[in-house]
């Protein structure tokens, strides 16, 4: 099953440059049964490998902007470290709340894909210096969920740079690649990567991303990106629902156990009273 998941996700990444973490994390949690931190770490390495394959198609065509890429990385890398640390700290409690937060973050990042580009190029040129600061929360979000570099990075570049769409996509893919490589190292250090599942994803993902890159110029990218963002949004909502359901079940179980313990403690004084009465009779 993981082979098929890897192929489908990689095909979408090759065609549009987005969807890696937004699809992989919900799939690994809902289908693979992985905990949140392991799903994010595994998705990070998988997304990094996919972008490593897709990046040359844009680098060799010089469809990226070095200056804007540098600004994005200056802000995003510190945020990436913070987001990773926060995820690991929350995951130590093994709480369904982590899954709920992941679902909310993934849903929000997918919803951003539906925003339109501002038409004021003068605004974009004058305010591009803010890219580093605006990229910081993208790094935090990516470190926590492995997603967002694609959708959020693209939206940021569309509105704070005057680049043409082809350069936006190329710059964003390289941005996501660097974040994925650094994020993979962070998560690997914390031991939050499932190697067997990762290899299965890669076996299906490598041919998928190659096929997607080969057909990228023949497919209407805009419509496909909207479709992928919509599916990712629904997957994020499903993750929230699954986390809420698990949280309710765990609370109900805890309440039942508490009630059982209270019942046992309630009967203990009666046993002590019987012992005192027996002693008096003797």
Please place each PLM-identified region on the residue numbering.
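Interfacial segments of multi-pass membrane proteins
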Residues: 24-38, 152-167
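Juxtamembrane transmembrane-helix boundary motif
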Residues: 1-9, 30-31, 36, 56-145, ...
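Transmembrane helix-bundle signature of multi-pass membrane transporters/permeases
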Residues: 40-48, 77, 169-177, 206, ...
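Membrane-helix interface "capping/anchor" motifs
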Residues: 13-21, 160-170, 220-222
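Short helix-coil transition sites and intra-membrane helix breaks within transmembrane domains
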Residues: 13-22, 142-150
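Membrane-interface alpha-helices at helix entry/exit sites of multi-pass transporters
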Residues: 35-42, 65-71, 162-173
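Transmembrane helix-bundle signature of multi-pass secondary active exporters and lipid flippases
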Residues: 179-182
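Transmembrane alpha-helices of multi-pass small-molecule transport proteins
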Residues: 42-57, 107
């Amino acid at each position: 099953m993981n082979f098929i998941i890897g192929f489908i996700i990689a095909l979408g990444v090759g065609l549009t440059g987005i969807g890696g973490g937004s699809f992989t994390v919900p799939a690994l949690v809902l289908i693979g049964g992985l905990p949140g931190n392991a799903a994010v770490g595994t998705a990070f390495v998988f997304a990094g490998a996919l972008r490593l394959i897709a990046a040359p198609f844009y680098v060799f065509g010089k469809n990226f902007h070095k200056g804007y890429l540098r600004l994005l990385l200056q802000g995003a890398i510190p945020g990436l470290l913070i987001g990773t640390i926060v995820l690991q700290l929350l995951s130590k409690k093994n709480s369904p709340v982590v899954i709920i937060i992941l679902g909310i973050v993934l849903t929000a990042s997918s919803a951003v894909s539906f925003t339109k580009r501002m038409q004021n190029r003068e605004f974009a040129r004058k305010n591009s210096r803010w890219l580093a600061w605006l990229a910081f929360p993208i790094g935090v979000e990516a470190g926590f969920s492995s997603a967002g570099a694609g959708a959020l990075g693209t939206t940021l570049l569309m509105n704070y740079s005057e680049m043409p769409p082809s350069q936006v996509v190329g710059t964003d893919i390289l941005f996501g690649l660097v974040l994925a490589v650094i994020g993979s190292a962070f998560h690997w250090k914390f031991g939050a990567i499932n190697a067997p599942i990762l290899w299965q994803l890669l076996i299906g993902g490598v041919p998928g991303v190659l096929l997607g890159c080969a057909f990228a110029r023949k497919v209407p990218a805009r419509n496909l990106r909207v479709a992928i963002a919509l599916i990712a949004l629904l997957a994020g909502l499903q993750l929230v629902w699954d986390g809420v359901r698990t949280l309710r079940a765990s609370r109900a179980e805890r309440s039942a156990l508490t009630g059982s313990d209270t019942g046992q403690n309630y009967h203990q004084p009666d046993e002590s009273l019987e012992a005192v009465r027996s002693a008096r009779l003797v």
